[in-house]
Regions:
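Acidic/histidine-enriched ion/cofactor-binding microenvironments in catalytic or ligand-binding pockets
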Residues: 18-22, 27-31, 83-88, 111-121, ...
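Charged, often glycine-rich, active-site loop that binds/positions anionic groups
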Residues: 11-16, 141-148, 209
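Acidic, glycine-rich loop-and-beta core segments that form the ion-binding/anion-interacting portion
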Residues: 180-212
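N-terminal accessory/capping or targeting/presequence segment of soluble
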Residues: 1-72, 76
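Residues in well-ordered beta-strands of folded domains
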Residues: 37, 56, 90, 195-197
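Flexible, acidic/His-enriched mid-domain "rim/lid" segments that flank
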Residues: 65-191
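Flexible loop/turn segments at secondary-structure boundaries
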Residues: 6-10, 44, 97-99, 202-205
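Generic beta-strand/beta-sheet core signal
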Residues: 2, 92, 197-199
Length: 212
């Protein structure tokens, strides 16, 4: 199960944390055993994972120019995590492919260097896209318990409160930066993408609030 700062939903759902600017892999076995393959900065977070997991260090999952001591081939790390040749192996990214051409099980949205390593470790013919297990029509994340619903409602409320706060403060002469600063709250990541623009949007390709 793959995760990075922009594609952390499935990874974070099971581990409780996102790997920020590093890549990360959660390897789950049928018997419940788990391993987390992570970079330098996330080794300390493995002990806090919701799913108890063995920590396996992969230095090149780290940011560029960080220490690379102890690096080993990724396929070797995957085998240590439990990926075995000839065993059916599911690779979970973040996107559910819904094409009608019958090839979705062999489309992968995970970085190619990781996909290729998984295929080398398990055998290319034994690797399939398994994202549907989490976000498919009958996926685990499609059913929410009361606690999850409360968290999603909290995120939704923060987002809508931010919009109301900005709308009520709107007055002539305010800049996009001033209004944009009202869209987030409580130091939380917003559950939607915040956009604050006035007048012609995307001037010179800029997508972010300015001081105009």
């Amino acid at each position: 199960i793959y995760g990075d700062v922009e594609h952390s939903g499935n990874f974070e759902y099971l581990t409780g944390f996102m790997t920020r600017f590093e890549e990360g892999l959660l390897v789950l076995q049928a018997d419940g055993a788990a391993a987390l393959i992570v970079g330098n900065e996330n080794m300390k977070l493995v002990k806090s994972s919701r799913v108890p997991a063995k920590a396996i260090h992969c230095p090149f999952f780290s940011l560029p120019n960080q220490p690379m001591e102890g690096e080993r081939p990724l396929e070797e790390l995957l085998r240590e995590a439990g990926v075995q040749p000839g065993r059916k192996t599911g690779l979970v990214g973040w996107k559910l492919f819904t094409s009608k051409d019958g090839r979705n099980s062999h489309r992968f949205d995970v970085p190619s260097f990781i996909t290729e390593a998984v295929q080398q470790a398990a055998g290319a013919d034994h690797v399939e896209n398994a994202t549907a297990l989490l976000i498919g029509p009958h996926g685990a994340r499609r059913t929410n318990n009361a606690n999850e619903i409360a968290h999603y409602e909290y995120g939704s409320a923060l987002a809508s409160d931010g919009v109301i706060r900005a709308m009520e403060a709107l007055q002539p002469g305010m800049t996009e930066l001033e209004l944009g600063g009202m869209l987030n709250a409580h130091g939380q990541r917003c559950s939607v993408t915040t956009i604050c623009a006035a007048g012609p949007r995307y001037v010179k390709g800029n997508l972010y609030p300015t001081d105009r």
